[in-house]
Amino acid sequence: NGNGKPGKGKLSQRQIDIIRKKIEKQKEFLRGQIKKSKVTQSEQNQLSNIEQSGAELKVVGQTYTTRYGGTTKGIECVVVKKMTRSLMEQSNFPLTSQRYSSKPEEDTLYSQYENEVLEGIRIGTLLGKKLQVRGESRDTVFNRQLVGKLDKRMVSALGYGNEHVFFTKETDQFKKANLHISVDASGSMGGSKWKKTMMNIVALAKAVDMIPNLSIQISFRTTTNELPYVVIAYDSRTDKFMKVKQLFKYLTPGGTTPEGLCFEAIMKNMVGSTTDMDSYFLNISDGEPYFHGKDMNYSGDSAASHTYKMVKMIEGMGIKVLSYFVADGNYGEESSSGYTFKKSYGKAASFINVTNVNEVTRTMNKLFMEKA
């Protein structure tokens, strides 16, 4: 613009500087680098929200090799361990839209997916009823054994040279199971893909809530202020299902896809398999890993290789990985993104159309009903 003023829709240099200062201040909050000065009420609220949500910065991507063979110093990833309503109301939370001109009786956040959440609860209730057999156990007693516990009813037979007076008991029951769902919350997941995905993850959360030996965590990954961002929105071990019903309707996708960087950031929070627990990691996304931020260009084969390395580390914890590419029209398995997706997840990669996202729920239902 010739008059030195910013063009329509563009930020002035002063506005850019103000935004940069705000971003740096938020990073300092997360790192705990708070300067000793009078804290405003707004800053106090922000600090309180960060503390309640367990937010922290984790350095990730230090093993990432660029397409030219170079290495990076890594990048900080924002990890929010507990999503709260107050955090969602903050302007720097990347997955909600605020109503700035809301009346006192109106909601401060835009609720765009209430119908999908309610439908998910309906489907999940039906699924939960089918899965309730998981909470049952069946004892089978084998009588007249040579070893085992003494069968008191057979004691009198000892005098007649009968040594088959013992019994054994086998209990047939399902192992405990844990499911971590990681959802791609990038902008391209919007529209019908997000609606179908929301319906299915809510259905799984509702079903798990009805079964005593199942647990579930749901995390969303996106970007904020040139950093990867991952938030654990729901953890059935500590949260009540009402949280899903009340808060998930506000979640809206945006940003890019820092896949492997976010997996790396929350890996220590994942639940590994044990002798009495099966663990699953379910990824839902619609494209290849991509993130461009300060000092890092995370894309193409390099990002796919890093993501694959993280997937292998997750599998190394005894966790079964399932990864679904939600395709839209012709943009699927045969596309360049489909190729990169396969490279990122290997044998764990599956392709589904936006019209049959319910396949995710059916697959988990089948896995939950398997016995070791």
Q: In which residue ranges do the predicted regions lie?
A:
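Negatively charged
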Residues: N1-L179, S192, K243
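Extended acidic, low-complexity intrinsically disordered regions
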Residues: N1-N3, K8-L11, K27, G190, ...
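Von Willebrand factor
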Residues: T171-I284, G316, L322-G332, E359, ...
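Short, contiguous acidic/charged loop-to-helix segments that flank catalytic cores in large enzymes
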Residues: S188-K195, F248-P258, N269-G272, Y290-S305, ...
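Secondary-structure transition/capping motifs at alpha-helix termini
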Residues: K206-S215, V271-M277, M313-M317
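VWA/integrin I-like adhesion module and closely mimicked acidic/polar interface patches used
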Residues: M267, G287-S344
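C-terminal helix of von Willebrand factor
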Residues: K343-A372
